[in-house]
Amino acid sequence: MKNRDSSFLGNKKVAVLMGGWSAEREISLRSGNAVLKSLKEMQINAKAIDLVSPEGSKLQLEDFDIAFIALHGRGGEDGFIQELLTDKEILFTGSKTEACKLAMNKVETKKVWREFSLPTPDFVEITKAGKSDMKITPFLSGSD
């Protein structure tokens, strides 16, 4: 691993947010632990925070200057944690709240792509459950 200068962080406390309550919890824990290991190797003051519920998230974020978001899926990529961190004035990695909310909404994201003439496959928005020969992907989650 190449040495990186982390002196700009000074004595800042970094929370590595991992786990979460989505179906992607296990991969998030692996990602978070890999990030934590790297930060510690760089002698950065980092601590793992395993978030298990939306309610608990609000309590566990005190006393940190920066959050490294290693959460996946709902709660981590949908704007929830970003909004919470923004409200608490904690700096964080990744996109801002509104970008996350938009990106997790597949239909709205495709509409934006089309607005900017970006190539994207045709799609149909289904608002009621019914039978279809199309593959249905979750609205606010991964693409199992």
Describe every region a protein language model picked out.
Residues Q43-I49, T120:
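Short beta-strand elements in bilobed, periplasmic/extracellular small-molecule ligand-binding domains
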Residues A34-N45, L61:
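A short, N-terminal amphipathic alpha-helix
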Residues S31-V35, I81, T109:
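Hydrophobic residues within alpha-helices
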Residues K2-M18, L102-D144:
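Active-site nucleotide/adenylate-binding loops and adjacent lid/helix of ATP-dependent enzymes
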Residues L17-W21, D63-M104, P119-T127:
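A short, GP-enriched loop/loop-strand-helix hinge that lies immediately N-terminal to
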Residues K47-L61:
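Eukaryote-biased intrinsically disordered, low-complexity acidic regions enriched in Ser/Thr/Pro
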